[in-house]
Regions:
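Carbohydrate-recognition beta-sandwich/jelly-roll modules
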Residues: 1-205
Length: 205
């Protein structure tokens, strides 16, 4: 299933000195396939070559996972030091829910607009939610913050939204003993079948 946002059809009220509404970010199906506090399993995020975040891990005070696909925009300054994470090289996320009564999961791929996407993940107890969920968030308008004396000022990109259409593909997965390995295999197959990658495993000796 592909879910898309046609950016040229987004209606905004262009900001003035006193009024106006502009869109900055879009979270795509944030609670799709979210797991509850009673569920067992984990989320898969592309931190480096891949990492798992266990459901209900009780890290309530830890910072929720957030990392920009292909790294941060270096043209925008940093006000705070980011948390220690590996760079995200692949626009793919997933989750596996397993237990006595269920064994299923999914893979999601940012197919269009991934260069302005970030990967987010929270566990139950973080950010006032009882769910474990991971999703893509797309920044459609650049913003920056700076200080002038004691005043904090935030500036936004003017004009219309210049980002391409945003598309995320969702792929349900179900099999006995489903694991993150199956998510990795599903993504490999997607790259071979849809992106023209070549399978070189037969040449390995």
């Amino acid at each position: 299933v592909n879910v898309s946002v046609i950016t040229e059809e987004i209606k905004e009220q262009q900001a003035t000195d006193t009024s106006g509404l502009v869109l900055l970010e879009i979270g795509m199906l944030q609670f799709f396939n979210a797991a509850g506090m009673e569920d067992e399993g984990y989320m898969v995020v592309p931190d480096g070559s891949g990492a798992v975040i266990n459901y209900n891990n009780r890290r309530y005070n830890a910072q929720a996972y957030n990392s920009e696909v292909y790294g941060r925009d270096t043209s925008i300054g940093m006000l705070t030091r980011p948390s220690k994470t590996e760079q995200v090289y692949l626009p793919v996320i997933g989750a596996v829910t397993n237990g006595e009564k269920t064994n299923h999961g999914y893979m999601a791929i940012a197919k269009s607009g991934e260069t302005c996407a970030s990967v987010n993940a929270t566990v139950s107890g973080q950010n006032s939610t009882s769910y474990n969920n991971t999703w893509f968030e797309f920044k459609v308008r650049a913003e920056d913050t700076y200080y002038m004396g004691n005043r904090k000022l935030t500036v936004y990109e003017q004009g219309k939204i210049n980002q391409p259409n945003l598309t995320v593909g969702y792929y349900p997965l179900a099999k006995e003993n489903l694991s993150y390995v199956d998510i990795a295999e599903a993504y490999r197959n997607y790259l071979i079948e849809q992106k023209g990658f070549k399978d070189k495993s037969d040449n390995i000796t």
